[in-house]
Amino acid sequence: MDILIISLKSLGYSRTARPLDSSPLVVHAVAGAGKSTALRKLLARHSTFTVHTLGVPDKISIRTRGIQKPGPIPEGNFAILDEYTLDATTREAYQALFADPYQAPELSLEPHFYLETSFRTPTKAAALIASCGFDFETNSQEEGHLEITGIFKGPLLGKVIAIDSEAETTLSRHGVEFVKPCQVTGLEFPVVTIVSAAPIEEIGQSTLFYNAITRSKGLTYVRAGA
């Protein structure tokens, strides 16, 4: 665990008041904070770590084990579970849990370490996220593009994400391919369009909206409300 704690401190994670002798070790980071990248580096440098995820696993590589789906843990290895908030029943075998608590706050635990800074989210999108009440900031040098209009007031570009059932029905009726926020956890796209039948004032503080807008690393379009 000492190696992991040293790594977290070097990456700018802050400590909470929760004692380190309480287990498992819980680490929280906002979307785009480099959580998965840090875990991959840990795997590459130390063979005694195993990292599983409830999100999207790494592709098979001949050079590294990568982040895998939950499975057998080599005896003696320090086991880490990423995206732990996606399932409350898969935590017992792990000594450390990582997640973005905003993606599933109802299943989040009190953390030992946290990081509120994203390195991916463009500044305009980050400002909108923060204005909706999330503790969120960005170090990205990209301003990005943010456009907010009614649901029928602009084109649907890039990866289209529907965040309510009415939006899903509307998109299906018009033959538009879309995904739900839960289908793109841990992924990122250069262009994202978020579609909702409700206006931004109603959806801004929702987990689904947060999950959707943090998938964008460039151009962000919000088509919401009438």
From Swiss-Prot:
This is Movement and silencing protein TGBp1. Belongs to the Tymovirales TGBp1 protein family. TGBp1, TGBp2 and TGBp3 seem to act together for cell-to-cell propagation. TGBp1 is the main movement protein that physically cross the plasmodesma with the viral genome. TGBp2 and TGBp3 would facilitate TGBp1 function. Transports viral genome to neighboring plant cells directly through plasmosdesmata, without any budding. The movement protein allows efficient cell to cell propagation, by bypassing the host cell wall barrier. Increases plasmodesma size exclusion limit. Acts as a suppressor of RNA-mediated gene silencing, also known as post-transcriptional gene silencing (PTGS), a mechanism of plant viral defense that limits the accumulation of viral RNAs. Residues 139-226 form the (+)RNA virus helicase C-terminal domain. Its main location: host cell. It is found in: Host cytoplasm. Residues 1-138 form the (+)RNA virus helicase ATP-binding domain. Keywords: Host cytoplasm, Host-virus interaction, Inhibition of host innate immune response by virus, RNA-binding, Suppressor of RNA silencing, Transport, Viral immunoevasion, Viral movement protein. One of its GO terms (biological process) is symbiont-mediated suppression of host innate immune response. GO terms for cellular component: host cell cytoplasm. It comes from Potato virus X (strain CP). InterPro entries: (+)RNA_virus_helicase_core_dom (IPR027351). Homodimer and homooligomer. Interacts with capsid protein. Interacts with host AGO1; this interaction targets the host protein for degradation, thereby suppressing the antiviral RNA silencing. Pfam families: Viral_helicase1. It comes from the Viruses. One of its GO terms (molecular function) is ATP binding.
